[in-house]
Curated annotation (Swiss-Prot):
Keywords: Protease inhibitor, Thiol protease inhibitor. Expressed in all analyzed tissues, but expression was higher in the pileus and in the lower part of the stipe. The gene is clt2. It comes from the Eukaryota. Pfam families: Inhibitor_I48. This is Clitocypin-2. Belongs to the protease inhibitor I48 family. Transmembrane segments: none annotated.
Amino acid sequence: MASLEDGIYRLRAVTTHNPDPGVGGEYATVEGARRPVKAEPNTPPFFEQQIWQVTRNADGQYTIKYQGLNTPFEYGFSYDELEPNAPVIAGDPKEYILQLVPSTADVYIIRAPIQRIGVDVEVGVQGNTLVYKFFPVDGSGGDRPAWRFTRE
């Protein structure tokens, strides 16, 4: 499995069945510390709130940290609880597994490295909020949320 290079990215919400939906779309957008991460268009006033530093750790997992302007402290993709449809919080950065979607070069499933019997915990979108979605580990469950990582 190809690993993502460390760098600054914008993260666009797509799906495994439609990894390149064309123009437009919604991007992971920070609204402040301890607040849910949103999915917003890549336009003003959101543009500067959609810049993320993605770093691979020694264990092969990644942190996704907000890299925008005027950040008094470090925060990134995090969670208070990992329950179905719980929001992704901009908080103390947690580690995630990035799984490349087959037949793509820059589309990944973002998975929380949590041991749950029979399920994968993945980052998706509900409404305009990033949330944790649960899917069977056997790959069933249909179209899955994925993210196009576009280097800045």
